[in-house]
């Protein structure tokens, strides 16, 4: 204790404190030395020729990694530049047709820029041009492509009819080919001579359009000749009747629009009255079987004039109290024609406008006006023309003025029994007799169906 209080003791304490502070100072110096040593070691480690192998190996590994990263970055940069260039090329090719077009804007600046992305389909379409069909990128078979021919693109696949396909596969089996195209090639080779004789498409003659227009006229002329009843001037009378047929049609119905076949059902009374005597003489001098001979040459399904052969089916159920409209009294020279023409009659309650009685299954016979027949007897009934539900109400507007005009224009000198046939298809063939003949189509008389009866239009 005394030592701590004296002077020496104080010095000892100071020495103790100095001793404690000395290690602190060494520690700071050591740290500075270590930093200098670390710097030296780092500077030595960067040198590959140093004696320290560990430091040199780590440095080389680091440098190699950095080099690989630099190469990868360079490759990515090149790929990006290539994509940029290809995208700009596509944009240029897309804008080029628009600038060439008539309404394309010629500006076409680089505004907006290219996205740098392109699809394989766009690239192929650009490379091969528009309108071409290219196989898929996977190289699959192109089963739906078309071939370019002289008349444009056509499908490669050909669809055959059933019987044609059966015959073709039979030929293929007989030839022993495994593919239909080989059989087609064989057929083309064997038919080469016939194919060479065919004209080219440009040299092929046009289809005869005039033949289709001349065919109805030839048919009409043949019909008028066969039903002219011995008239040598049937062509002239037919043309005159067709020219004057529109005079009886009302103007409101548009007579100029009505076809010649409809006009032929209504021959002019002036032409009929002018040729009444000639037609009556020709009709009188004709043989009794003229009707059967003239109608046998035509098809029953088309003209419906085989009334004589089918009269046992058509008129078998008509009542016996109906009087005959055509008799042999007014036509001398036909002694045996009265029995043959008995079937051409109309019931007593039938009117002059051609409406038959019964169940509505009647035939229209517009007969010449007799002496003493007034207009009240002609239009005794005001009902429209009917035929088994067929809409013939529109024909009333044609028949009424025709019948009235026939009454006013028929000469009084014509006998009541004189009968002449008006031309049914082409005009007035035999004079002022029947003004029309209409046979309704597909009528049934008590369960029996008429065969080959149609309406002559």
From Swiss-Prot:
Protein origin, superkingdom: Eukaryota
GO cellular component: nucleus
Comp. bias intervals (Low complexity): 210-225, 268-278
Coiled coil regions in record: 58-84
Compositionally biased intervals (Gly residues): 101-115
Swiss-Prot/TrEMBL keywords: Activator, Coiled coil, Developmental protein, DNA-binding, Nucleus, Transcription, Transcription regulation
Region (Disordered): 95-119, 199-231, 263-299
InterPro entries hit by this protein: TF_TCP_subgr, Transcription_factor_TCP
Quaternary structure note: Forms homodimers and heterodimers.
Identification of the protein by name: Transcription factor PCF7
Native source species: Oryza sativa subsp. japonica (Rice)
């Amino acid at each position: 204790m005394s030592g701590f209080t004296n002077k020496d003791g104080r010095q000892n304490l100071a020495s103790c404190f100095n001793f404690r502070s000395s290690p602190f100072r060494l520690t700071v110096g050591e740290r500075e030395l270590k930093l200098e040593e670390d710097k030296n070691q780092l500077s030595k480690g960067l040198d590959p020729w140093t004696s320290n192998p560990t430091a040199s190996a780590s440095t080389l590994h680091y440098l190699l990694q950095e080099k690989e990263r630099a190469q990868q970055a360079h490759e990515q940069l090149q790929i990006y530049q290539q994509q940029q260039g290809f995208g700009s090329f596509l944009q240029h090719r897309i804008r080029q047709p628009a600038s060439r077009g008539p309404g394309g804007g010629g500006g076409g600046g680089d505004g907006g820029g290219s996205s740098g992305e392109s699809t394989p389909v766009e690239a192929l379409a650009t490379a091969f041009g528009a309108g071409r069909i290219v196989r898929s990128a996977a190289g699959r078979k192109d089963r739906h492509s078309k071939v370019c021919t002289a008349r444009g693109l056509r499908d490669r696949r050909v669809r055959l009819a059933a019987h044609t396909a059966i015959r073709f596969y039979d030929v293929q089996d007989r030839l022993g080919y495994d593919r239909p195209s080989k059989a087609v090639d064989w057929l083309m080779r064997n038919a080469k001579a016939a194919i060479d004789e065919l004209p080219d498409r440009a040299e092929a003659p046009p289809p005869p359009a005039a033949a289709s227009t001349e065919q109805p006229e030839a048919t009409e002329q043949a019909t008028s000749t066969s039903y002219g009843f011995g008239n040598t001037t049937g062509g002239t009378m037919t043309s005159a009747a067709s020219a004057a047929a529109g005079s009886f049609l009302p103007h409101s119905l548009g007579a100029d629009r009505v076809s010649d076949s409809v006009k032929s059902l209504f021959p002019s009374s002036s032409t009929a009255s002018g040729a009444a005597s000639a037609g009556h003489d020709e009709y009188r001098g004709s043989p009794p079987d003229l009707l059967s001979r003239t109608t046998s040459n035509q098809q029953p399904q088309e003209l419906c004039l085989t009334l004589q052969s089918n009269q046992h089916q058509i008129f078998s159920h008509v009542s016996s109290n109906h009087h005959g409209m055509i008799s042999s009294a007014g036509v001398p020279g036909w002694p045996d024609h009265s029995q043959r023409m008995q079937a051409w009659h109309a019931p007593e309650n039938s009117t002059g406008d051609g409406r038959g009685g019964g169940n509505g299954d009647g035939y229209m016979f517009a007969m010449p006006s007799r002496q003493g027949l007034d207009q009240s007897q002609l239009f005794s009934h005001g009902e429209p023309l009917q035929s088994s539900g067929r809409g013939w109400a529109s024909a009333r507007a044609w028949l009424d003025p025709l019948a009235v005009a026939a009454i006013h224009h028929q000469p009084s000198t014509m006998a009541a029994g004189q009968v002449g046939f008006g031309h049914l298809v082409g005009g007035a063939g035999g004079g002022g007799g029947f003004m029309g003949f209409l046979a309704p189509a597909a009528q049934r008389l008590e369960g029996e169906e008429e065969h080959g009866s149609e309406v002559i239009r």
